[in-house]
Amino acid sequence: MLKILKESLKTAPIVKRGTYNYFIHPISDGVPVVKPELLRDVIACIVKNADLDVDKIVTIEAMGLPIGASLSQITDIPFIIIRKRKYELPGEIAVHQATGYSKGELYLNGICKGDRVLIVDDVISTGGTLAAVIKALEMAGAEIKDIVVVIQRGNGKKIIEDMGYNVQTLVTIDVDENGVQVLGCIDDECK
């Protein structure tokens, strides 16, 4: 499991954003192309490992969308998209998020008090986006049953764990000017 994801990460191009080595990958960026077999690889691993006894799947715009939509189709669990755009619907919750390379507002709609949710996202690096999502879900009165992120890079997972939540990550990577190194994965087949 995850062979396609691991191999695709090892060949991901690297670009500099200031001093930040940014990897470009179909799961995290949607370019150059998101191949169905890559998405199937990722979704199969999430289905195998996530707590799916939930009312809703929560994902974050933009690259959480293919993950959330695919997972929703497979599991028949509805999904909610946390957007970067305000809709001004009743009950909308706005939270500020900051990442390693951007900041802005996120908007949560469609969550009711008591909803049991699974959060899925593409990458965790600084933990800024996920921390903001958790804060919004807590404000809405949701019960966060599980958090699954495809790619872990950096110390963001520890930040979320310090908030009292476990984060399952499918693969852990390091990125430098030479490329992406896969350091570990949710199954023991990474070595």
UniProtKB/Swiss-Prot annotation:
Its EC number is 2.4.2.8. InterPro entries: HGPRTase-like (IPR026597), PRibTrfase_dom (IPR000836), PRTase-like (IPR029057), Pur/Pyrimidine_PRTase (IPR050118). GO terms for molecular function: guanine phosphoribosyltransferase activity; hypoxanthine phosphoribosyltransferase activity. This is Hypoxanthine/guanine phosphoribosyltransferase. Catalyzes a salvage reaction resulting in the formation of IMP that is energically less costly than de novo synthesis. It comes from the Archaea. The keyword Transferase applies. The gene is hpt. Belongs to the purine/pyrimidine phosphoribosyltransferase family. Archaeal HPRT subfamily. GO terms for biological process: IMP salvage; purine ribonucleoside salvage. Pathway: Purine metabolism; IMP biosynthesis via salvage pathway; IMP from hypoxanthine: step 1/1. Pfam families: Pribosyltran. It catalyses: IMP + diphosphate = hypoxanthine + 5-phospho-alpha-D-ribose 1-diphosphate; GMP + diphosphate = guanine + 5-phospho-alpha-D-ribose 1-diphosphate. GO terms for cellular component: cytoplasm. It is found in: Cytoplasm. Homodimer. Keywords: Cytoplasm, Glycosyltransferase, Purine salvage, Transferase.
